[in-house]
Amino acid sequence: MTAIINENVKISECEEMIMKIIWDEDGDPDLDTVTDKVAIRFGRRWKKQTVATFMTRLMKKGWIDIYKLGRYSHYHPLITIEQYRKDKMMEFFDLYPHMEKNQIFQVVTELMTELVG
């Protein structure tokens, strides 16, 4: 089941970084994995408690589910990267409804490159 992004529930830039890490994982990552990968990929050296706070916010916003496996919490995305990308593109088109097709294609190409990574 694909969750629909609630237009009133936006995520911050930091939460978006964390979501990108979660989406890129093969399974549902734990706190240590997310903390380490945010530091490597984005250069953010956050403490585990900071990342855990962002995770709790993402859960409250309906973006992820948190579950325990043994003594570790794991994070499962409730919104797919595809749905997120679609939502971001629709936001853009809402801002610029009168763009020509070639302009739209150029912008979409740039957005996709940025969102991938």
Task: Identify the residue ranges that each predicted region occupies.
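Amphipathic alpha-helical dimerization/coiled-coil segments
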Residues: K88-G117
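Short helix-coil junctions and helix-kink-helix linkers
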Residues: D36-W46
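Short alpha-helical segments that sit at the start of domains
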Residues: M1-I21, E25
